[in-house]
From Swiss-Prot:
Pfam families the UniProt entry points to: Pyr_redox_2 (PF07992), Pyr_redox_dim (PF02852)
Domain comment, as recorded: Contains 2 FAD binding domains and a single NADPH binding domain.
Gene: cdr
CC cofactor: FAD
UniProt function note: Catalyzes specifically the NADPH-dependent reduction of coenzyme A disulfide.
Keyword Hydrolase: no
Residue numbers binding NADP(+): 151-166
The name this protein goes by in its record: Coenzyme A disulfide reductase
Residues that bind substrate: T15, Q19, R22, S39, N42, K71, H299, K427
Entry annotated with the keyword Transmembrane: no
Reactions this protein catalyses: NADP(+) + 2 CoA = CoA-disulfide + NADPH + H(+)
Length: 438
């Protein structure tokens, strides 16, 4: 009976194991997870802190016991894979509770160890990062135990923005700092102004081009020379792949520690796959490498690997489109396609339109700004971005499908919109992009 070992039990690993079991009732499947919890919703964590998700239990899909009862898959939490011997097809495992080490053999190995939050490196009792439910619980307990009021949020990516909004809605007083003036980097820089407007509207302090120099108790010294006091600091300064344990194997890593995979999600070593935040692949619509550490890619890759292991080698990963979205107070920001700094590799043109998200005469209308970049050589869409209070997700998802099917910008005129006054226009913003590009 084949033995399948999975490293990591969150989005990619647990989903892949579950899909394998759906297709294969016989194989022995075991998952090693270095942390306390499995199958939790990373994306829910800021909303747990903000009490939008009323109970943290809703962010936890399975316990190991429930997973085994439902699927006959063994999950061992607090078990960290610390080395891979790909020649012998074994992994070395550390039981983090007992410090016992042992080896586990495998016929197929699936790597989904995810990523860890970067830290600023200060030794302080008031600094926290947010990456898993343990972090969430620690933040929650600290807030309650210390009657936290003033919170410093460091970083301006989507996690930091979500955390800040949820702290504010919880009734706390957050301040945002970021080391540069480039915020929410997945968006076009000039489309991010509503982020600052939303902060200003609520009188939430923020400083760009600012960094922490020292932390002494609750006293924070900044690069600008300011000295301020905070009850708590939450750091959102990026992540790094959990690939240290892979370095001793023959598995190829890129210079950032990610694992390049082929379209079957295979590494360069036979019988070893990589999925989720650890893996890097390519775009679907253009010939460029891509790393997109978001939930969709982990779930899609999990299903493909399950099919591959079950014997269906016709299903392959066709690449990322990089579709992403974030809510910040009243606004939604979304983009799809190559990143802004990758556009320079193309001869491109940009076309944009700003108009109401639905019919102007219908109540509650607000502007939606939609922008599309296209390749001048074949007129295919390279990237799209949108910002507004409503209708952003619909337009970006439609453009994602257009890019998936390699439509030209001109073909957007043919998009047949589901029109009624509360939802759109007879000629939607997407249609208008096509007309303006002609």
């Amino acid at each position: 009976m084949p033995k399948i070992v999975v490293v990591g039990a969150v989005a990619g690993g647990a989903t892949c194991a579950s899909q394998i079991r759906r297709l294969d009732k016989e194989s022995d499947i075991i998952i090693f997870e270095k942390d306390r919890d499995m199958s939790f919703a990373n994306c829910a964590l800021p909303y747990v802190i903000g009490e939008v998700v009323e109970d943290r239990k809703y962010a936890l899909a399975y316990t190991p016991e429930k997973f085994y009862d439902r699927k006959q898959i063994t999950v061992k939490t607090y078990h960290e894979v610390i080395a891979i011997n790909d020649e012998r097809q074994t992994v070395s495992v550390l039981n983090r509770k007992t410090n016992e080490q042992f080896e586990e053999s495998y016929d197929k190995l699936i790597l989904s160890p995810g990523a860890s939050a970067n830290s600023l490196g200060f030794e302080s009792d008031i600094t926290f990062t947010l990456r898993n439910l343990e972090d969430t619980d620690a933040i929650e307990q600290f807030i309650k135990a210390n009657q936290v009021d003033k919170v410093l949020v460091v970083g301006a990516g989507y996690v930091s923005l979500e955390v800040l909004e949820n702290l504010y809605k919880r009734g706390l007083h957050p301040t945002l700092i970021h080391r540069s003036d480039k915020i929410n980097k997945l968006m076009d820089a000039d489309m991010n102004q509503p982020i600052l407007d939303e902060l200003d509207k609520r009188e939430i302090p923020y400083r760009l081009n600012e960094e922490i120099v020292a932390i002494n108790g609750n006293e924070i010294t900044f690069k600008s020379g300011r000295v301020e006091h905070y009850d708590m600091i939450i750091e959102g300064v990026g992540t790094h792949p959990n690939s240290k344990f892979i370095e001793s194997s023959n598995i190829k890593l890129d210079r950032k520690g990610f694992i390049p995979v082929n379209d079957k999600l295979e590494t360069n070593v036979p019988n070893i796959y990589a999925i989720g935040d650890i893996a890097t692949s390519h775009y679907r619509h253009v010939d460029l490498p891509a790393s997109v550490p978001l939930a969709w890619g982990a779930h899609r890759a999990a299903s493909i690997v399950a099919e591959q292991i079950a014997g269906n080698d016709t299903i392959e990963f066709k690449g990322f489109l990089g579709n992403n979205i974030v809510k910040f107070f009243d606004y939604t920001f979304a983009s799809v396609g190559v990143k802004p700094n990758e556009l320079k590799q193309f001869d491109y043109k940009m076309v944009e339109v700003t108009q109401g998200a639905h019919a102007n005469y219908y109540p509650g209308n607000s502007p939606l700004h939609l922008r599309v970049y296209y390749d001048t050589s074949n007129r295919q869409i390279l990237r799209a971005a949108a910002v507004g209070k409503e209708g952003v997700d619909k337009r970006i998802d439609v453009l994602s499908m257009a890019m998936m099917n390699q439509l030209t910008v001109d073909e957007l005129t043919e998009f047949e919109v589901a029109y009624a006054p509360p939802y759109s226009h007879p000629k939607d913003l997407i249609n208008m992009i096509g007309y303006k590009a002609k």
